[in-house]
Amino acid sequence: MDYGLKNLGNTCYMNSIIQCIRYTGLLSLDDDDFIQNCIKTEKRNEFGLMREWLRLQKSFIIENDTKCVNPIDFYKSFAQNISRSEYTFVGFEQNDAGEFITILFDLLHKCLKYKIKLSVQGDIKNNLDRIAVDSIDYWKKFFENEYSYLIQSTYSQLLSITSCPKCDYSTRNHDPIQIITLHMKPQFETIYDMLSHYTSVETLDSDNSWKCDKCKENVNPEKKIVFWNLSDILIIQIKRYDSNLKKIDRHIGFPILLNMNKFCMNYAEQSMTYKLCSISVQSGSLNGGHYYAICNTDIDNKWKVFNDSNVFDIDFSDMMQQKPYCLFYKRI
């Protein structure tokens, strides 16, 4: 059912993100991996948050004459969990949608987390194999004691390579990433331009200079970031505010089918093609803006606007002219 969500007073940013998540299929009642994780950890109830999330998901599939779901119980549980956590959140005041994604996923992850054993199979035959072993070691460090369906589905792995410009010495580091944050520049026209810049070689300044362990020279090292592995769900956030908090309100081209081959090492040889499921759009300014979602519905393959309780069709051409703040892609 393509139901809207009631605005409870400046909750448009939360409503927008929940609709975007919903149309990826993530954390849904139809997702067997999610349900199995819920069963495995059902005794862990973070102040009712997972229970209220499941009830909210059920509300989306029950016949409702108003065509609108009231998320009050879930938002109350979310606020209670925030009050017991280390997060600073302003309740039902205007907040950042990207911040809401991070906190929501972390709180739900705490409901789902469990221990997992990670091990390396096979022999190391080349440098890529060595990097793969290192990546698993880093993954164990971050997640072996707190793994979950959400880690599996939404966390990618970055590989940063810092190298000496005077010899072939380099160091590597792996980091998990859940939201890919891309910065706008005047010359960028598409998301591909932004991703190319994100993964380009950067010469570090004198504040970050170091003495090379191999040639012993003091150098300004070169740093390059690539994706080592990519998650099934990709969340891309476009930073639309400059250092003075002025909104950069211009269109950036975004594809329906996103090809990440150019930006990922893809050691696991997975598909690097992603389909756009939903976008979150912010109109207005940072402090006085309004969020709404545009999602690709499963049944009729139409694009629809979810503006709080209002739901209506949007032409494909109009959707492609939107200026999204967050984009949700799913591996195909």
Spell out what each predicted region is.
Residues 156-158, 165:
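Folded extracytoplasmic luminal domains of secretory or organellar precursors
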Residues 11, 161-163, 233, 292:
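Beta-sheet entry/capping signal
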Residues 159-161, 209:
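Residues immediately within or flanking Cys/His clusters that coordinate Zn2+
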Residues 1, 21-25, 30-44, 136, ...:
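Exposed substrate/partner-binding surface patches
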Residues 1-128, 184, 233-238, 316-324, ...:
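USP/UBP deubiquitinase core
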Residues 124-142:
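Intrinsically disordered, low-complexity regulatory segments in eukaryotic proteins
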Residues 104, 164, 212:
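Conserved S/T- and glycine-rich ATP-binding loop of Class I adenylate-forming
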